[in-house]
Each structure stands twice: as C-alpha cells, then as structure tokens.
Amino acid sequence: MSGNTFGKLFCVTSFGESHGPALGCVVDGCPPGMELSAEDIQQDLDRRKPGTSRHVTQRREPDTVEILSGVFEGKTTGTPIALLIRNEDQRSKDYSKIMDTFRPGHADYVYWQKYGIRDYRGGGRSSARETAVRVAAAAIAKKWLRARYGVVIRGHMAQLGPVEIPFKQWEAVGENPFFSADPDIVPSLEEFMDKLRKSGDSVGARIRVVAEGVPVGWGEPVYDRLDAEIAYGMMSINAVKGVEIGAGFASVSQKGTEHSDEISPGGFLSNNAGGILGGISTGQDIVVNIAVKPTSSIRLPRRSVDKMGNPAIVETHGRHDPCVGIRATPIAEAMLALVLMDHALRNRAQNADVACTTPKIPGHTGPREGQEEGPSDSEPKVEFADDPEPDEA
C-alpha cells in the first residue's frame, strides 16, 4: 500500500491499524530548536479520543502519545520525530460476523478487490482511528505556526444532520462534546443524538475550521495551490465527501459584484474567497467547511454480498460513532495545520528574500467569524478611480 505520506517539506508518514498493537507516524522536516513535550501533543489527542461522551463510540482508548525520537532536552533537533500511540481497548470479536461480508458504504469491498486481503477488525487501515496520529503530528505544526507567525487554527461543528448550529463564541467550543460554538443549542443536539442512537442509525455533519493570522503569500499558483492542497488534505479524512473554501458552492448563485472581495487601504471588505486567491493566501482568515457522511457501520440490516458474491444481510454490531462528525473537528484542524506548515516552510525556502514595497492590506476591516462582514465604523472613505481598460489576454 502506497500513499501513506503527506506533505513535501513537512512530511508525515503514518502507520498502523485500528486493532493492531499500535498506531504511529514519523514527522520529517520539523525545524530544530522548538520546545516540545508529550503534553503539547496530548492536549489535542484528548479532544479527539473516543469514549468521551455517550454520543460517540464507547471504545476506551487513552491515546497516550510517546515521543520516540527527534526531541533532545525538551527541544526538537531537526531530525525525524517518531510518535507512537498504543491500542489498548480492541474488541476484535465484534467483527467476526462481517469477516466474509462487506459493509455497505464502507471500504471493505474495495480493499478486498484491490489487495486480495483485508483486516476486517474495525476496518483495519481504513478506520478513522488512523486520524489520531494526524492530530498528534499536527499538534507540532500548530505550535510552530503559532510561535513563528501567530497563526491560530480552530474549528467547530456547524451542522449536525439537519440541525444548523449558529456560531456564537469560540469559548463555547471546548465546553461541550459537539464542539458547538452555540452553548444554547447543546441540549437539542443531545436529544437528537439520543433518539438517533436508540434507532440504530447514523447521521452526517458539517465542520468549519478557520485559520487566523496566515500571512499573505503562502501557496503556489498552479498545481500546488493552497486551496487545492487544503481540499486534498481534507478529502483524505475518513468519511469526508465534500469541501468548501470561503463561499464555496454558494458562489454559484452570487454575482461578481457580490462575490469579489473588494479591497480598501484599511483592509478587505469581505471574504468570499476564504482567504485564498489564485492559490495563494491573502492574509485574511482561511475558512474551510467539510461535509462528513453518516457512519456506514450501523445496527440496522442492510443488503450486501459476501466474498463469493452471494446476497447477504449485514448488521454491524460493536462500538461505533453514530456520527463520526462529532469527533472530526480536531481532525479537520489537524489537516489544515499540516497543509499550512508545509507551505510555510516552502514559502520560506523559496521567497525569504522577496521584498515588496506595497503595504500589506489588513485581512479584516470588520468583525470575524459569526459576525457580519464589512467595513468597521472607523473605515476611511475611499474614492476609487474609474477602472482602466482591461489588458488583452
């Protein structure tokens, strides 16, 4: 199996299966000299780990991280950082009934056809358990980005099934199991999930993740566009079926006068582009939404086939998330952090000596997430000259 490495300069190679002895990764390209401890990484792992509420899988994994290399006397050395997370609560017998059949909506069938063998225990390599090491690696990236550039990456659940979750305050996100930025809606979300869990069914979710403080200039203009690599990273997360950056699909119904983010000396007047133009960061917040599909492992009977191609009825028992989106927020944050870290290093390597005399435009003239965009009360009035004749293509 190839394709287990993410990134070009900040590279993360992961390994391990859901019911194997351990999961792990090797992080190559971390700059030397940054203070780093297991506690720095554990904070984000604790946000993602299973068994934290009745609304997620009851598999009890401490997800304790071990740093095996790349850190000496509390600081990164610039050599590969190896991280290990041991599996401690596997219950493989729960999967004995599906060892010869394929779960609808799961990777079981395509793994079998591609490799001629599959680890049916918890989905093996296709399990979302693999994302634990992404979160661990990204904790390193988050710390470096914040220390070096002041970049802050955070996310929240924006929709649970049919329930839209309005944004109210970042402070609320860490105070409930849904990563909801609206504390008032949490009781309704709990009631919704209690009914869903009793029914044996599952549901999807939408997660929004925002990166603040990203400087102008990160990203490449053609194949390695920043937004393209963000979409690539987000789509690599298990169960993600859609990615929006900025206005996303809403831009279809917008007009040019509405979608194009006007610029004044005081800042951008909107952020429909989601902080990226031409594949390069603008200095505005980078805003990403992802769609997470309903969990395919459900207790309700579903039609499928067995290894011989015969009809079969599949009911999946065991410990599963009725909504994998509930724990997806730190994973989405992680993938955005990994992309930004990689591009930060790439930009530094190629463009460190570039000096532009044009003043940098502030990313915002008004309020941020959850508030209406637009000029602030102190925004100076600017008169714009008539547009010049367009250049020939």
UniProtKB/Swiss-Prot annotation:
Pfam families: Chorismate_synt (PF01264)
Catalyzed reactions: 5-O-(1-carboxyvinyl)-3-phosphoshikimate = chorismate + phosphate
Keyword Amino-acid biosynthesis tagged: yes
InterPro entries in alphabetical order: Chorismate_synth, Chorismate_synth_AroC_sf, Chorismate_synthase_CS
One MF annotation (Gene Ontology) recorded for this entry: chorismate synthase activity
Binding site for FMN: R125, S126, S127, N238, A239, G278, K293, P294, T295, S296, S297, R319
Protein name: Chorismate synthase
Quaternary assembly: Homotetramer.
Protein function: This reaction introduces a second double bond into the aromatic ring system.
UniProt-annotated binding residues for NADP(+): R48, R54
Cofactor: binding comment: Reduced FMN (FMNH(2)).
